[in-house]
Amino acid sequence: MKSKLRVLRAERGWSQADLAERLTVSRQAINAIETGKYTPSLQLAFKVARLFAMPIETIFSDEDEL
């Protein structure tokens, strides 16, 4: 799964640790999502979408999507 998490985080000047704290997850989880090694749960995806005030599909997309 592709994500725009790294870009959105960087635009706000947040470190991985900052974002992890806001989402109550580990920094390692943020790193794994950003590198595509981990697909977030639906619950976490909704938390991310609320935090950035964007639809989930704007932040996350299937790698096979064109």
Model-derived features: positions:
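Short basic helix-loop element that most often maps to the first helix and adjoining turn
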Residues: 3-22
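Short, charged recognition helix plus adjacent turn
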Residues: 50, 60-66
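Recognition helix of helix-turn-helix/homeodomain-like DNA-binding domains
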Residues: 25-38
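Alpha-helical and His/Cys-centered functional microenvironments
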Residues: 20, 31-32, 47
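Residues in the recognition helix of alpha-helical DNA-binding motifs
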Residues: 8, 22-23, 33, 62
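Long, hydrophobic alpha-helical segments
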Residues: 42-45
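Residues in the helix-turn-helix
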Residues: 18, 29, 58
